[in-house]
Structures are given as C-alpha cells and as structure tokens.
C-alpha cells in the first residue's frame, strides 16, 4: 500500500478560503494536496480595494472591528498595510478616525441642535443597542420595535418632566432622528428591515476590543499576502462550481464552461450565504442563474433550514466626488464652517417634506467626506435602497444626490457631484449580497448548524469513529459570535482547516 496525500479543494478565494488553504499548507506541512478554486478573476471575495478621485477606497469590507486580538489586524500589520510611507500612500477612508463633530440637519435645511435634540436621541440609540448586545434588552422580536419602544418611553419621560414634551414638531424630529440611526444599524447589519433583525441574537454578537480602524494600504493587501504565501499554482481562477457530488468518496466538483472536473477527499465550501440560498432545492441549476450550485445529494434538512432562516442582506457604498460651485462668505453654521472646512460631516433626518428627494436616497444615514477636508463624500445604503442603487444610471444617481444636498444644505456654497463610484454586491452572481445577520425566527444555533460538516453524525463504522468530513463549510455566516465580519470569515477558514488536521492526527489512514 502506498500512502497518498488527501486532496482538499477549497471553493472560494476570499479571506476564508485563503485562510483555510494557508493553514493546511502551513501547519499541515506536506500532508495535504491543496487546491483553491475561485469563480472570479481575482482573489479577495467581498474584500475589494479600489481607487477613486485620488483616494484609496474600499468597495467591500471596510473596517477592522477591534484591533486587540484581531487576526485580521495582525495580518494587515504583517502585510505592511498599516503604515504607508509618507508621500507614497493615497489618502484613504477614515484616515483621521471618526469625526469629532457632525452636522445634523432635518429635511428642508433646519440644523438640529446637537445638545438638546440630536445628542439625547443618539445617546438613547447607543444605550439601547449596548444593552441589547449585553443581553440586557429583555424580550424577543425585532430590533426596530425595541428601539421604538425606547423612543416612546423617552418622549413620555420628557413630557412628564414638564413643558409638554416639546410638542408635535419636536416629536416628528425625534422620529426622524431615530429613523436616521435605524438606517445606520441597517448598514451595520445588512438587514433591510430592523423588524427582521433578531433582538435576542444581538446579545451573542461580539467585536474584538479596541478601536475600529481602516487599513491604510487597503484591505486587499491582506488577502493578496495570504494568496502569495501559498505554493505556486494553488489558486486557480475562473472556475465556477456548478455541481457538487458529495454523497461518496471522492467528492466530485463540476464547473461551468466545460472546465475539467476535479475530485477531492474533502471540500471546504466558502461561498456566500447568498449563493447557498440561491442553491436551495435545486439539484439541476438550469434556469436558476449563474449563482446556484447543484448539490448531489441535496443538502440535508438541518442545513437547508438554517440557510433559509438566516438573514443575508446587501450593503452598498456610493462614493461621490463633490465640489462647491458657488463661493460663500465664511460663516459659522451650528459650529461648522462649510466654506472653510470643506464638505461637512452631514447626518440627515428625513421628514418627508421635500418630495424631490427620491425614495432610495432616504435610506442613507449620512453623506460624509471620507476624511476631513476631502472632496470625496460617501453614503452607505442597505436593503432595497442598496439594491435599487445598482440599477440606476449614473445620471439618475447624481440627480438624486443633488436633490438631497439641495434640501439639507440649502445655503451657499451649493455642492455638486462631479462623478460617482459605487459597489454592486446584490447583482454580483458570485455573492448575491454582502453579509449575514440573525433574522427573527433564526438564532445563533443556525450559525452553528451552518458550520457543521457533512456527513453529519456517526457512519456505520463498527468503531463508531466520527465520519470523514467530506464537505466542510466556512465563511462569515458560519461563525456564531463574529458573523458578518472579515475576522469571522478568516477564523472559520482556520477552524475548518484545523478540523481536517485533527481528523488526520486522530489516526485516520489514507492509502491506495
């Protein structure tokens, strides 16, 4: 008998797939034959650094959510992406951190007082979300109703304190401010409707400690370093998986466009939850679109049900190069000097008073420069607004932006949009969205189910050893506490590589 190396095929060259391959090729030494197959023409998946108007911008993953103990932060440091040489690097998103001051404006141009109106509502929102993430919210259901209950209680307490609570007009501003923060939460979580975001699950979500930062050299540097560390030829681009026959050994992978099939002892599947949702119940992918994978046999019920219950939304970014087209005398508007300091950090409370603003623009919380003084402004969109943004011609997007700016910044200077750049994750057939969330009716248990390898449970082997994991699952939607993040994707890839390492260290033989 001649021992042969177990063959592992990793599907997807995002950070999860590259992490799995890197771990197998590193800790595994020469134990495995590893291949990474990627449907697209690049590595990185939902990590994609680009350039726009002289700035380095992130079209996908943007933040390192906590720097203390974060493997992604460590990877960025090791890749030399955290410190650009002075004069060589491009300016980049949030290079100056979070702004100290923002300009909150109600639709129509009325500046909202930061101390007496905007500040208390922001404190209410932050306090309630902190309580939810500490598991102290109480009850279940969706996050939106939880926040609205809090607003009603706040307004009742203010009214009981005298002065009649500020009247109907102030309550309308309160509602608009809460809606603004709800839009922020939608982009943070990818949920189209916060009524569908499970309140209880918020208590399980965790970030790493420390500040949230962006990567000066670009997020793509992280995945490029992982890919470069793999043996030459490990990553194969342009192979779109169409059928996965996993019922026996070897597992067989069939690709689109007549590419030769591959066989493997183990497959680590790192495709997005959006692609898995598109693949549900379809043994034959004809007519389903380019995204779906035909599983043969179909995925077992526990896996299909977890895929169906979990939420997977879309978040898109709209970058706008802006310019002031009319000069103005320097004037202090609520502590902000637009003419002198450039485009303001604008937070927008929509009240429905200006019909020229299109509905999809009302789904963003803010339009802010990517750093202080920048002529590149950024707006985030989630859900139906994000998806609709992808369908619009550039001219329509610019007109919508102009209508919004004219309403919220009516005083001189008038800000105009010269050109735009936007992401398009909803219609990208390799992803069909951005990241996962725990929907009402789902739970963290479904994230654990997503991570379970197949086949599940003991085989018929007499020694009752666990079955050899033929199909393993990694990606951000398979991590119970860090889902939706790049570090969840990375950690899950390492987890599945470790699962295979442990399987063979446990005494499994592979001979032919």
UniProtKB/Swiss-Prot annotation:
Note describing how the cofactor binds: Binds 1 FAD per subunit.
Keywords: Cytoplasm, FAD, Flavoprotein, Oxidoreductase
EC number: 1.5.3.-
pH dependence remark: Optimum pH is 6.0 with thermospermine as substrate. Optimum pH is 8.5 with spermine as substrate.
Enzyme class: oxidoreductase
GO BP annotations, alphabetical order: regulation of timing of transition from vegetative to reproductive phase; spermine catabolic process; thermospermine catabolic process
Temperature-activity note from the record: Optimum temperature is 30 degrees Celsius with thermospermine as substrate. Optimum temperature is 35 degrees Celsius with spermine as substrate.
Cellular component GO terms, alphabetical: cytoplasm
Matching InterPro entries: Amino_oxidase (IPR002937), FAD/NAD-bd_sf (IPR036188), Flavin_monoamine_oxidase (IPR050281)
Compartments reported by the entry: Cytoplasm
Swiss-Prot/TrEMBL catalytic activity: spermine + O2 + H2O = 3-aminopropanal + spermidine + H2O2; N(1)-acetylspermine + O2 + H2O = 3-acetamidopropanal + spermidine + H2O2; norspermine + O2 + H2O = norspermidine + 3-aminopropanal + H2O2; thermospermine + O2 + H2O = 3-aminopropanal + spermidine + H2O2
GO MF, any single term: polyamine oxidase activity
Inducing stimuli: Induced in roots by exogenous treatment with spermine and thermospermine.
Necessary cofactors: FAD
This protein's pathway: Amine and polyamine degradation; spermine degradation
Annotated residues for binding of FAD: 38, 46, 476
Location of the region described as Disordered in the Swiss-Prot/TrEMBL record: 448-470
UniProt superkingdom: Eukaryota
Role of this protein: Flavoenzyme involved in polyamine back-conversion. Catalyzes the oxidation of the secondary amino group of polyamines, such as spermine and its acetyl derivatives. Substrate preference is thermospermine > spermine > norspermine > N(1)-acetylspermine. No activity detected when putrescine or spermidine are used as substrates. Plays an important role in the regulation of polyamine intracellular concentration.
PANTHER family found in the cross-reference section: FLAVIN MONOAMINE OXIDASE, PEROXISOMAL N(1)-ACETYL-SPERMINE_SPERMIDINE OXIDASE
Family: Belongs to the flavin monoamine oxidase family.
Record-given protein name: Polyamine oxidase 1
Taxonomic lineage from the root: Eukaryota, Viridiplantae, Streptophyta, Embryophyta, Tracheophyta
